[in-house]
């Protein structure tokens, strides 16, 4: 007997679309929900690292999507900074929306699952750098921040430009908020300055893939950019007005199966073996011929188990006498909590009663010949050998 195992991985692709006056960013992630991995696997953010040259803008090729990851948007926001006690004219002003829900829809079944998207960091590139002119301490650095952010040493400055990136306080990542630097010279008013990039950190709270069927899921999220919008960087003229996020998630569950050495061959025996049968009298017809094939299995979602037969017998298989071609029907049973007949049409099995992953589970297939008339015919061929190839296909694509 040969057991074919189909292994599958998971890709998450998040695409930022490009409508009119919209920023565009591509974010990709991969999900390998292997039950044999620690934690059963997670979505991995595989977005190519677009790290800036300045210290503190971070990337990780192995980070899961529930860890903060960066992105930046090239944009132009022309501003005039002035100290008039109006925060939207402050040296820095960064307002952001709270968590947003996205509906991921299976492209075949129409079944949907929730995905949550939220920001963890926010910042910008300002050019020219007017900090030294505006600040009382005569520095190029924007180390100070008030409101719903906190400084985390993620700044870089030169006379021509200043980059700043602040941590959003944990309680505001889901709720939204605003951050600002309004402590500068009371008489200061800039001629003009511009934000050339927006820096953002984000996390995804993905649906539980162990509860998702294989296939492609899609969803989208549109965020507005501008005054009193989802992303607001204060008074100014904005070159882009929205950010469209298109999500595509591919789910393919993995299977791992370990058969014992020699597991590609099984020998069917009567209860107690042939020696016992001979001892009790060869004229007696055995009640059955059977063999069990044990194996270890790891899988996290429903799988389909199908037979393929060298000698088909309807939805089951025959084995064949090598001398005279006598065909004998053999039954193949999947055994976990009960014996279930496996067929060429295939049957769907869950990893457990409650749906939790099967991890290194001990299972077995039982091969049986039980028909008394068939067994009687077989006993008329002493010394004969019956053979047949039965292929068991484990398929996670259901």
Task: Name every feature range the model reports, one short phrase each.
Residues 149-218, 228-238, 351-387, 398:
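Exposed beta-sheet edge/beta-hairpin loop segments within beta-rich domains
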